[in-house]
Amino acid sequence: MGNAKRATQNDEDYTFVSPVVKYLLFFFNMIFWIISLVLISIGVYSRIVKHETALACLTVDPALILMVVGILMFFITFCGCVGSLRENICLLQTFCIFLTIMFLLQLLAGVLGFVFSDKARGKVTDMFDNAIKHYRDDLDLQNLIDYGQKQFNCCGGISFMDWSKNMYFNCSDDNPSRERCSVPFSCCLHAKEETIINTMCGHGMQALNYLAASAFINTNGCIDILVNWIHSNLFLLGGIALGLTIPQLVGILLSQVLINQIQDQIKLQNYNQQHRSDPWS
């Protein structure tokens, strides 16, 4: 009789749910939950500090992107955290489904970007042209463009003449700006030993032909150089893309394993409950 009771007690204490899987999934989601709060905070801060039209030149406000990504990540990781901790199948399935959808959307975006590379290039060119037009409107945008032009040794989207699309650098005769026919200093060729940057080095460069201007500034556009850089660093970009997808695949795998374990545990509990009520069944 005593052995039968101990056997029944052991069956009730036994669990299919692995603590390793359960708490690994919990801490995995906790890390990304904290990251989501950081993204939301940065996005909200940027929206409050910046003027409404500060980054209107871009297709989508980066602060808004951060907020949307942060809120979406917060919801998904919340489902993962609570679902794993409380062993809630509904929340875990929600977590798994959203992660799967995100993974498939990223895969689809990569395929579409490769198939429609010409349209993607045209979209990037339009964005760069818009950024040029608003170069003086926002300091952060200005610093971003200057950093890109210095980093890639380029000037403008297609060529340095693109800077004529900016009202201050426009080369038309009726432009009263002191920067007429100029380009930003980030287009200039700087010697490595040069410690003081001449911010007026791009003055009047649009009035020169390509050959004459190339002695003072980078005349090649940033779009072609960016495309060449992407082609030269495909393995690096592929590694980054893989690094972004691995956590998602790990999350999907762990959540699915935990769901199966919880379902097995529920079956065991139902069996034990039925066995207690009818030991002869």
From Swiss-Prot:
Database matches in PANTHER family: TETRASPANIN (PTHR19282), TETRASPANIN-33 (PTHR19282:SF154)
Gene: tspan33
Described function: Part of TspanC8 subgroup, composed of 6 members that interact with the transmembrane metalloprotease ADAM10. This interaction is required for ADAM10 exit from the endoplasmic reticulum and for enzymatic maturation and trafficking to the cell surface as well as substrate specificity. Different TspanC8/ADAM10 complexes have distinct substrates.
Species, as recorded: Danio rerio
Membrane-side (Cytoplasmic) residue stretches: 1-23, 84-94, 255-281
Domain of life per record: Eukaryota
Chain positions carrying an annotated carbohydrate: N170
GO BP terms in the entry: protein localization to plasma membrane; protein maturation
Residue intervals passing through the bilayer: 24-44, 63-83, 95-115, 234-254
Name listed for the protein in its UniProt record: Tetraspanin-33
Assembly behavior: Homodimer; disulfide-linked.
An example Gene Ontology CC term for this record: adherens junction
